[in-house]
């Protein structure tokens, strides 16, 4: 009988586990700014959109969380589903003030979550400080979040990042705490 690869693997080598928190959303939604702000507890605006992949580790009192942001422009969206299977949870960032792109964001979000019906989902309705921003109840409706499934943990946060260098708003801290708890629960 031929041994399987698993039998040949070294016992000290850990099996590959889902360990990254994916940060996805259309280009211009504010994913990088949100991620940097979560990491540093300070508002840090990003100017250029992510071209490719951006990984960030955030330490909490109890653990270390690995975030993987994948660019939101069309050439990079094809990678989203490939990495989804390796994710602990999905953070999906939308620009609350960009009304014309919400149907596109909804389409991609629903394609992603259809592939994994139990993957926890955290939606950031970003740029809530802008005058044109939809309220989170409007974002909930525009993204059809009531259709994400009963087996999935889903959370929606209205977020904004104001002055560069200032402390992150309490909503962002609450979101960070929740993400840490969700990640710990899934692992």
UniProtKB/Swiss-Prot annotation:
CDD domains: Arl9_Arfrp2_like. Gene3D superfamilies: P-loop containing nucleotide triphosphate hydrolases (3.40.50.300). GO terms for molecular function: GTP binding; GTPase activity. Keywords: GTP-binding, Nucleotide-binding. Pfam families: Arf. PROSITE patterns: ARF (PS51417). SMART domains: ARF, SAR. GTP binds at residues 25-32, 69-73, 126-129. The keyword Nucleotide-binding applies. InterPro entries: Arf-like_GTPase (IPR053254), P-loop_NTPase (IPR027417), Small_GTP-bd (IPR005225), Small_GTPase_ARF/SAR (IPR006689). The keyword Ribosomal protein does not apply. SUPFAM superfamilies: P-loop containing nucleoside triphosphate hydrolases. Belongs to the small GTPase superfamily. Arf family. This is ADP-ribosylation factor-like protein 9. It comes from Homo sapiens (Human).
